[in-house]
Regions:
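Hydrophobic helix-and-loop "lid/oligomerization" segment in the mid-to-C-terminal part
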Residues: 2-25, 32-62, 77-80, 160-288, ...
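Short, motif-level signal for alpha-helix interfacial/capping segments enriched in acidic residues
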Residues: 2-7, 87-89, 139-141
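An acidic intrinsically disordered interaction segment
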Residues: 1-7, 98-107, 127-135
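Short alpha-helices
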Residues: 109-178
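A generic local secondary-structure boundary/capping motif
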Residues: 9, 72-75, 95-98, 122-125, ...
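Active-site cofactor/cluster-binding pocket
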Residues: 65-121
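Short, glycine/acidic-enriched loop or turn micro-motifs at the edges of active sites
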Residues: 26, 30, 88-90, 113, ...
Length: 325
């Protein structure tokens, strides 16, 4: 991982109040990073407002929704206020929160290679498996250690973005050392696992079954494609969307190099999630349509009907999975 830039430490030292903001449609790494950094800043004597546009549709982060404001609160405004944006590098990714953000200095902290960060401080480390590890590095660079509660948040985020360490390889010893620090500080891997994988509704399992049934092979099975319709979401509810396990099941199919799940947001707009093995750069495909993410996990929002979006995205896999690849 890259060292914490001195200008970020100076940025934190110079300001007294922080709007700690994450991306819309937050996940465990985003929420865990915000909660841990916010807690550390508070016990360092800083004012903190945690902001998220939501929605908190993932069951594992739903218990934390009440800790976040969907807007930047006016009462936190001060001359020494600043914003720290976590797990994304564009104000366009923070949703409606951006409309309430006053003209303050901004620091971006992210681990996605694709981005357009333009702030007073930009700390991007695409070698970091999770932003929570970058937050741990910031805490340590400021001479601190995470509390038990902060360690729980950080381990939760780390487990989220690494698939509970499934996505790590032999070059990941630094990550396991960091995880060991968090466990030593009181974080429980067992609690993190149950938070990530427990509490699912029966409806979510039924929706998963339908989505699996619809999966169709492309490129001789190297790409598996499925979708979730508006009718599905009306029938099973938004809280039933549980794509992480679905991706695992699809990628476990012999010969599968990538999985794509398309979710209708309206008749003219779809959210697309991509998961891949080493052969495919999902982040590059997503970026070509205005999205972003990592090589192995990425996403985007695309205008168009379900079939139109599906065929556009399937064609984008040609350089990786086509006959001439």
């Amino acid at each position: 991982m890259r060292p914490v830039p001195p200008e970020l430490l100076d940025f934190i030292d110079r300001h007294q109040t922080f709007y700690v903001i994450g991306h819309k449609e937050p996940d465990g790494d985003c929420v865990g990073s915000q909660l841990a950094l916010g807690s550390f800043l508070k016990r360092s004597g800083k004012g903190v407002a945690l902001c998220s546009a939501g929605p908190f549709t993932r069951t594992e982060i739903l218990p934390y929704e009440s800790r976040f404001s969907p807007i930047v609160p006016d009462e936190k405004a001060s001359e020494r206020a600043a914003a720290i944006v976590l797990d994304c590098s564009s104000l366009g990714r923070i949703g409606d929160v951006a409309q309430t953000l006053p003209p303050v200095q901004i620091a971006f902290i992210d681990h996605h290679a694709a981005g357009e960060a333009k702030g007073e401080v930009v700390f991007i480390d695409d070698r970091a498996p999770a932003v929570t590890l970058m937050v741990l590095a910031i805490i340590e660079a400021m001479g601190g250690k995470p509390t038990k509660e902060e360690a729980e948040y950080l381990l939760f985020g780390l487990c989220t973005d690494t698939g509970f360490f499934r996505h790590l390889d032999e070059s990941s010893s630094e990550t396991f050392l960091a995880a060991s620090k968090l466990v030593a500080a009181g974080a429980s891997p067992k609690r993190a696992f149950h938070l990530m994988n427990g509490g699912k509704s029966l409806f979510s399992r039924k929706l998963m079954g339908e989505t699996l049934t619809r999966a169709e092979p492309r490129y001789d099975g190297a790409l598996l494609v499925s979708y979730v319709t508006l009718e599905d979401q009306q029938r099973y509810g938004l809280a039933s969307r549980d794509s992480d396990m679905l991706y695992q099941l699809l990628l476990s199919v012999a010969g599968c190099e990538a999985a794509m799940i398309i979710r209708q947001e309206s008749e003219t707009e779809c959210t697309v999630g991509l998961r891949a093995r080493e052969r495919v750069d999902g982040g590059a495909i997503a970026a070509s349509f205005g999205g972003g993410g990592h090589r192995l996990a990425a996403g985007l929002l695309l205008r168009g009907g379900l079939e139109e979006v599906r065929e556009k995205l399937v064609a984008a896999f040609e350089p990786y999975l086509g006959e001439d690849s």
